[in-house]
């Protein structure tokens, strides 16, 4: 167009959005896919927005960060619970395995102070009691 207004007719655009042929080949990706996560960033962002006071603004990177932390902690707990299930020679993770995994790890134990339903209790026998039982066994063996 004469006068320098509008798009130039020289073939190259002066900026802005790309032409239709280049944009059509790109497939839309979610925030989770871009960050390489399995957990949904959009849902976490929505929960963050809903649960803040006075409907504060939440940045996209904050939601991705919180999602990554949640995914990491979940993977850590599931790995330890899977190992506990494998040690007991079963193929299904139960609340008992989750309890053993969380209470067996010092850092997770301090982080997760909740009571796990149907988790049971950790097996623990006081050392003083163990010594008495062992001494009785030795005494019986010497007498017999």
UniProtKB/Swiss-Prot annotation:
SUPFAM superfamilies according to UniProt: Histone-fold
Top-level taxonomic group: Eukaryota
UniProt subunit comment: The nucleosome is a histone octamer containing two molecules each of H2A, H2B, H3 and H4 assembled in one H3-H4 heterotetramer and two H2A-H2B heterodimers. The octamer wraps approximately 147 bp of DNA. H2A or its variant H2A.Z forms a heterodimer with H2B. H2A.Z associates with the VPS72/SWC2 subunit of the SWR1 chromatin remodeling complex. Also interacts with RBP1/DNA-directed RNA polymerase II largest subunit.
UniProt name for this protein: Histone H2A.Z
Signal listed as a keyword: no
UniProt modified residues of type N6-acetyllysine: 5, 12
Family recorded in the similarity comment: Belongs to the histone H2A family.
GO MF annotations in UniProt: DNA binding; protein heterodimerization activity; structural constituent of chromatin
Cellular location(s): Nucleus; Chromosome
Lineage start: Eukaryota, Fungi, Dikarya, Ascomycota, Pezizomycotina
């Amino acid at each position: 167009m004469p006068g320098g207004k509008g798009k130039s007719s020289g073939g190259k655009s002066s900026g802005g959005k790309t032409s239709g042929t280049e944009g059509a080949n790109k497939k839309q990706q979610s925030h989770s896919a871009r960050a390489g996560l399995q957990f949904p960033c959009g849902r976490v962002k929505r929960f963050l927005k809903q649960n803040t006071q006075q409907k504060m603004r939440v940045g996209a990177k904050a939601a991705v960060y919180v999602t990554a932390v949640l995914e990491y902690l979940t993977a850590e707990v599931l790995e330890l619970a899977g190992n506990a299930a494998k040690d007991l020679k079963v193929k299904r993770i139960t609340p008992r395995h989750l309890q053993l995994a969380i209470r067996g790890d010092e850092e997770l134990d301090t982080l997760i102070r909740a009571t796990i339903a149907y988790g049971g209790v950790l097996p623990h026998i006081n050392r003083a009691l163990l010594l008495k039982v062992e001494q009785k066994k030795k005494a019986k063996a010497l007498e017999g």
